Curated annotation (Swiss-Prot):
The gene is plsB. The lineage of its organism: Bacteria, Pseudomonadati, Pseudomonadota, Gammaproteobacteria, Pasteurellales. GO terms for biological process: CDP-diacylglycerol biosynthetic process; fatty acid metabolic process; phospholipid biosynthetic process. GO terms for cellular component: plasma membrane. The HXXXXD motif is essential for acyltransferase activity and may constitute the binding site for the phosphate moiety of the glycerol-3-phosphate. This is Glycerol-3-phosphate acyltransferase. InterPro entries: GPAT/DHAPAT, GPAT/DHAPAT_C, GPAT/DHAPAT_LPLAT, GPAT_PlsB, Plipid/glycerol_acylTrfase.
Amino acid sequence: MANFINMYRQLLSLPLSALVKNNPIPANPIEELSLNIHQPIVYVLPYTSQTDFVIFRRNCLALGLPDPAEKNEINGVKLPRYVYLDEGRRIFKSKGAKDETTTIFNKYLELHRTSESLDVQLIPVSVLWGRSPGQEDKSDLPNLRLLNGIQKTFAAIWFGRDTFVRFSQAVSLRYMVVEHGSDEKIAQKLARVAKMHFAKQRISATGPRLPNRQAMFNKLLQSEAIRRAIEDEAKSKNISIEKAQKEAYKILDEIAADVSHSSLRAVDRFLRWLWNKLYSGINVQNSNRVRKLALEGHEIVYVPCHRSHIDYLLLSYVLYHQGLVPPHIAAGINLNFWPIGRMFRSWGAFFIRRTFKGNRLYSAIFREYLSELFHRGYSVEYFIEGGRSRTGRLLAPKTGMMSMTLQALQHSQTRPISIVPVYVGYEHVLEVDTYAKELRGAAKEKENAGLVLRVIKKLRNLGQGFVNFGEPITLSNYLSQHFPDWKEQNHEEKPQWFTPAVNNISKQVMININKAAAVNSMNLVGTALLSSRQRALSREQLLEQLSSYQQLLQNVPYSTDVVLPNVTPQAMLEHVLALDRIGVLIEKDNFGEIVRLERSSAVLMTYYRNNIQHLFVLPSLVASIILHYEAIQKDLLLDAIRKIYPFLQGELFLHFNEDELNVQIHQIINEFARQSVINSNDNFLSINKSKVRILQLWSAGMLEILQRYYITVTILQKQPAISRAELEKESQLVAQRLSVLHGINAPEFFDKAVFSSFIANLKEQRYFDESGYTVLDKIEELASTLSHLISTEICLTVKGTIEKSEDLSS
């Protein structure tokens, strides 16, 4: 019988290799699932299928996993390397598969009793033939069900390129023996647990059935909240109920997605072509976190940072290829233009107006629609920053969508809701040229199909893209930890805990996004070149600085989620030089090669520097203090950092608390000393003159931030009673003048938002009294600290500009 099965498998191999593509999930199971290939592996499949076996085996061999067709030999005993939980259909089905599997499990458990070093890993594996969830009003089942031979043939032809082999987290038999013993009941329990796992996996791969859009509209329009809003609309505008209902339907039609699985499959092919045209690879990290949440039945809300319009497509593409359901995406109404709007809608986009404050009907409809998505179990994605960052830094969170998410939890949401922060990064952002023009004062160009095509047509060779899933926040757990009484007050429309919770969770999302930063060659090369006054370094200096950056990021990690490049500084530089339209040039003179950043590209490069500025700000501050004092006691350095840190924390969403800050600073000092960038003797730190250039380049990352803080603080010294609005305006004007006089290219240097953030942090740190008047003692102490870290030339320019401004206004 075994020979016939092998012959049959060989017959299947040729057509299947032509029709079915290798699509393993995850892409590298050994690394991502932490598999120990030195211990025996047993693959657990849901049911007997020779077609599935051939596809699954081919993927195993391609991934360097043990061949499932061979047997495990343990202490002279040979046992199968795979088991089936259930019988299959038609040819070669395994009668008594359940009993056979239990027997094999028992034999493996018996071996664990006699060999203490043995740890067999059970890996659930399933082959997913297409992933259409089906429609609510149709009786068909998704194609993950058990298929017969004829159905498999059609599936191979139709879904061949959309067939995935899903490897799940391994179960340690050693752990099972230690925790539960090794009798026969444990073997049966293992089989039951594996069956439940496959059932959950099917749901996590396809998601709930797609809704009948019209039926969904009818249900929503009959909801109490929307009916009340319609009545209020009719009364306030003095129109009939019928007219208000038509307006409500129109709004709902404007908002709602119209997902089509066939459209998703088509765009998947297009996106595969697009990424290959534009990028040399998409690096995905920590997706296992999300798969775990999906298997546990969580309602998942993806909250990525927003760099580019292409973020919408990238995250859905990545999730689809990680075996997860692409989410419903909250997209700006500006993207609802022909023909993109209709296409986006079919891929899961639902549209939101930029502002709907005061529009009670729109607000009620949008809130109920979002709540309905949660209720039906669809994952959702929204951009908490509200719009794309033009500077490369995270923007302050807009809390409207988070507020509606918490309202959904508050109003009888039965499944746990987990927020998944996502870091999205690129070595070249498609719209970066447009951002630079807008920051120079050009009007924002309205989105249209022609603009999209023009951008894509002229770009290629953009390096790599990065998607890193940050630490999830399960809302009920967060609320129970920080607002223990939240359930008791849940009957109130807007309980006391609600607004602080929305603000705190939104802030924590930003912190977790930054904790998941993916550092790339472009970030590091750009940071080094922008740290030089002339935006140029010798090749040797640049490579030395890149090495210093790389060593510190590895030895003093910002967080365990940060992803670092694993190539040499030389390889990083060559990679950046090979990218198109970057503006990094090599020039030669009698002394060697100089790497230079074109002046016109300086503003563009600050975008990539700013992506990872939060990772460098503390080492830059340490370097800046030591450089300006030349020699300083550790205690004094720590004292200066403690004064400045709260403002950096608020502006850049840093995650260190006071105790963690002290540990991080000491580790940075030790690393600088290890690199011989500074001298460290007991409680005394000083510059190492032979490495002072490295220290100067490190310190440059803080200069513009300190200068901005100094501008605002100096204005407050001169005008302690100034209003917040005037303080923001005055700070911005002084910064603009300083940027012109001293050639500062950073686009955020005179951005009103960063001054607003700093002033808000001053208030939070009690630099203003209850009446809003400046607490001069505290401000003067902060001004003194800042003035010691800024050049005399800059200090004089700031003071002179402020005095001139006062003269003009008097």
